[in-house]
Design a protein with these regions (language model features):
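ATP/NTP-dependent adenylation/nucleotidyl-transfer catalytic domains that generate, transfer
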Residues: 6-7, 23, 161-163, 220, ...
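Enzyme catalytic cores with a strong preference for nitrogen-chemistry domains
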Residues: 1-347, 365-374, 401, 406
Length: 637
């Protein structure tokens, strides 16, 4: 439960129809196994203490009493377990029978939640035996305890307030307006569904989509426990299709007719963060009653999958679709700006590196979209002290194969003159030595754009902006930045996508060589072999780490300790802990110190959910203090 993680499971034990003693034993044994495995929330199927398929036996008072006795045994067993459990049983209230979810924790019956929507179609005849949930919440004496009874019940953990649970039962989810919608608006972050959904052709896919979509719509975690082996097969079969979804993502699943057990860690902090950002998620807690309960805080071992590259889809087809869409978005944004500005040219500084190559590809797509010749793209290479033959050659070949106008402007003489103007020693390889080159290049591009009636297309990417790895008013500045919302890890895949998609072998070859070239601003002289000496990732750290950190800082607002923990899970097989922590500290230091550059960014299209535009998703003062984050980092080591 530390860092907002909660280990939870859905369980579908084998049962015997109407054998409450056996079913109770199965339930208790499953609870004990789950608790021993560190689970703190277990959800069982609908009417699991009796079996869903009892039919008119539900009217038998002996069965009702046996179910209540079974619940009492579950309560007694739960007293020794650090676990909340939800079990299903029939409950008679004032001469009417209700299909209920019983919420159990530490020997206490926290609440009874009756089913709202009773199916009475096809193979289902629930209205024959049961009544729909009554309005409001009342107190009952049941299983030897005073207990709240009703649908408008929330169960909140005192030690972990973001763990707020509510329940619904099977058909409730299939209704046009499920009770879980109201539960979530009232504050529930976890929805438990006790279900007995029989299996028919195509139903598993529909069920999976339904649970996933509801978790996305409600910004919650949704646990769905399905009836399974042992239910009557007189007219139906039940598949124990258990599901756990979180904000639209399937975290765990027990395949139909499988083991009937799904287990994972819920990230409740993530759900709370999502709701904080969503202004359309308006709380509605009228008439709801909150029941507090206690569970000990414990550190949960993470077994859930954490992507090492959160910006990049793991599936090949999904990744290709993502790359194609991003290219289309970038090109459309640039095309609109070119048309609006009546620009005659799109001027790009081309270095032979990844970012400028992507910007050039985008500009070519934009011109084609506008029905204009690719020659209207003016690509300019400006070699200086650190330019290598490899990058210079790749820049020219790329421009030739794309059919753009290519121009070379050596800037060495201009930079030397500028050094003399400001008294910079030519042998002093400091920040001034580097930034002078970047600013001279921007000056050349801006003036070329003026002379040709064009606009300067920016090449800097999201990762560089997060780290401030750009010269202020140098490569930091342009007239429209097409890459500003694309992280470096994704830039690579987009360029590779273009390489794979083209039928031009020469173009493919040069793009692949650019992908193989070390990332560098080439502002310091090459080594004795004429190769790149200044490699970005050896100076600021691996971009796959910084992109990982950036994603969780901006997307969910997680703190350093939780991000470090996630990084160890996702990237621990590639980097030792001390390296992960070193670059995490470096990320925070640079992120806070470099905000002043992000406060005056050029326009550029929003691409994903993580962006640093000062006019859009990220508004941060340039002089904010990082002491809070630094203190948390210091505690990590």
């Amino acid at each position: 439960m530390i860092h907002g993680f909660l280990k939870a499971c859905t369980v579908s034990p084998a049962l015997r129809v109407a054998d409450c003693a056996f079913n109770t034993q199965q339930t208790i044994a499953a609870m004990q196994r789950a608790a021993a495995d560190g689970v703190q929330l277990a959800v069982f199927p609908e009417l699991g203490l009796t079996g869903y398929t009892c039919g008119d036996l539900f009217f038998q008072q002996s069965l009702q009493r046996a179910a209540a006795k079974g619940l009492a045994a579950v309560l007694e067993a739960s007293a020794a377990l650090d676990l909340m459990a939800l079990v299903g049983l029939p409950v008679a209230v004032d001469g009417k029978l209700y299909n209920c979810a019983a919420v159990v924790c530490h020997g206490k019956l926290l609440g009874l939640v009756p089913k709202t929507y009773l199916p009475n179609y096809g193979e289902f005849y629930e209205k024959r035996q049961f009544n729909p949930a009554p309005a409001g919440v009342r107190t009952l004496h049941f299983a030897g305890q005073e207990v709240p009874f009703g649908t408008k019940l929330l169960f909140r953990c005192a030690e972990m307030p973001e763990f707020c649970l509510a329940a619904e039962v099977c058909e409730d989810l299939w209704a046009p307006l499920p009770p879980s919608t109201h539960h979530a608006l009232a504050g529930a972050t976890v929805i438990a569904n006790l279900s007995a959904s029989d299996e028919t052709i195509g139903k598993a896919d529909y069920r999976r989509a339904l649970v996933s979509q509801q978790s996305a719509r409600l910004l919650c975690t949704y646990l769905y426990a399905d009836a399974g082996h042992g239910e009557s097969t007189t007219d139906m079969v039940f598949a124990a299709h258990d599901l756990i979804c979180e904000n639209g993502s399937l975290l765990a699943e027990s395949r139909p007719f499988g083991p009937g057990y799904a287990c994972t860690e819920l990230d409740l902090g993530r759900m709370v963060s999502e709701r904080c950002r969503s202004t359309t998620f308006q709380p509605e807690s009228e008439d709801y009653q909150t029941v507090m309960f206690h569970l000990p805080l414990r550190e949960v071992e993470l077994t859930r999958y954490v992507s090492p590259a959160p910006f990049v889809p793991a599936d090949d087809n999904a990744r290709a679709e993502r790359c194609e869409l991003i290219l289309a978005m970038q090109a459309d944004g640039l095309a609109k700006r070119i048309a609006h500005a009546h620009a005659k040219t799109a001027v790009i500084g081309i270095s032979g590196g990844l970012d400028s190559s992507l910007a050039l590809l985008v500009a070519v797509h934009a011109m084609k979209q506008l029905g204009r010749p690719t020659q209207d793209v003016l690509a300019v290479t400006m070699p200086c002290f650190g330019t290598t033959h490899r990058t210079r050659s790749n820049a020219e070949i790329l421009c030739e194969e794309l059919g753009v106008t290519f121009q070379e402007i050596p800037i060495t003489r201009t930079v030397h003159s500028h050094f003399a103007d400001i008294g910079q020693g030519e042998a002093v390889l400091d920040v001034t030595y580097e930034n002078c080159q970047a600013r001279v290049r921007t000056l050349e591009l801006m003036d070329l754009a003026n002379r040709t009636g064009g606009l300067v297309v920016g090449t800097g990417d999201l990762s560089e902006l997060a780290l401030g790895w750009a010269t202020y008013n140098g490569d930091h500045m342009s007239m429209y930045g097409v890459n500003a919302d694309v992280p470096k890890t994704l830039v690579r895949h987009i360029v590779r996508y273009e390489a794979d998609a083209t039928e031009n072998e020469a173009l493919r070859a040069v793009l692949l060589d650019i992908l193989d070239t070390p990332v560098s601003p080439e502002l310091l002289p090459a080594n004795e072999n004429g190769e790149i000496a200044q490699q970005t990732e050896s100076l600021v750290g691996p971009y796959e780490l910084h992109d990982f950190y950036l994603y969780y800082v901006l997307r969910f607002g997680f703190g350093p300790a939780k991000i470090y923990r996630l990084a160890r899970r996702a990237l621990g097989d590639r980097y030792p802990d001390d390296v992960l922590l070193h670059w995490l500290k470096n990320f925070y230091r640079r992120f806070f110190a470099q905000q002043f550059k992000r406060s005056c960014l050029p326009d550029g299209p929003k691409i994903g959910s993580v962006t640093l535009s000062p006019r859009g998703d990220w508004r941060m003062p340039s002089d904010a203090c990082a002491a809070v984050w630094q203190a948390e980092l210091d505690q990590l080591g």
